[in-house]
């Protein structure tokens, strides 16, 4: 048999085996539920912690914080490129994470499912800011919601669900806010911060 034919066959077979193994692994682990998201946030230490912002603009300074009902999506997809330069996640994990990032666009956080969180209507907040502009919109917002707000992404898990990527941002005015993307690893029944990237503060 021609040597080039054999080489091509081996390459094709290897690629087929990899994709089949990946699909099989994903199908076995593709059982992430909405409850998994809530369990993560309810067993995770604050991703920041915040040391540079005080009073009502420090998300750690209040017992009950506001959370926008619509999970953050786009920023997390962009930030994973930096995280994936590390060796924390395997190639199969990365493919699985990308697959998860395309789902749950219609998910809305539910009231009472996360400890210490008051879920507020993301569409209403967006309407306030869009219709009045942020300079006028923030005073209108505060009259209704009293405190600044958090935005969380859903956690994106590794195949074995022992590691995940999650984004959190906090805004309290036109001039103050912060956020970053984090990698967490599960130790016992707690999620512990492993790595942070792409932080921003304004």
Description of each model-found segment:
Residues 1-33:
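Bacterial Sec-dependent N-terminal signal peptides
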Residues 25-163, 172:
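Flexible low-complexity loop/turn motifs enriched in small/helix-breaking residues
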Residues 161-187:
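Exposed beta-sheet edge and beta->alpha loop/turn motif
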Residues 10, 14-21, 41-42, 85, ...:
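Compositionally biased, low-structure terminal segments
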Residues 182-201:
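Short beta-strand edge/turn micro-motifs at domain boundaries
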């Amino acid at each position: 048999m021609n040597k080039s034919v054999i080489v091509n066959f081996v390459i094709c077979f290897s690629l087929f085996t990899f994709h089949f193994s990946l699909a099989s692994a994903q199908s076995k682990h593709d059982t992430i539920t909405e409850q998994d998201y809530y369990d993560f946030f309810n067993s995770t230490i604050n991703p920041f912690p915040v040391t540079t912002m005080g009073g009502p603009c420090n998300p750690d300074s209040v017992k009950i914080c506001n959370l926008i009902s619509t999970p953050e999506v786009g920023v997390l997809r962009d930030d994973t490129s930096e995280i994936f330069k590390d060796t924390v996640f395997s190639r199969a994990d990365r493919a699985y994470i990308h697959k998860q990032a395309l789902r749950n666009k219609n998910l809305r956080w539910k009231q009472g499912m996360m400890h210490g969180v008051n879920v507020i209507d993301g569409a209403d907040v967006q309407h306030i800011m869009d219709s009045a502009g942020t300079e006028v919109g923030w005073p209108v917002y505060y009259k209704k919601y009293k405190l600044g707000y958090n935005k969380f992404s859903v956690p994106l898990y590794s195949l074995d669900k022992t590691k995940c990527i999650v984004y959190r941002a906090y805004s309290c005015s036109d001039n103050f806010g912060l956020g970053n993307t984090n990698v967490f690893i599960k130790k016992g029944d707690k999620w512990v911060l492993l790595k942070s990237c792409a932080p921003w503060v304004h």
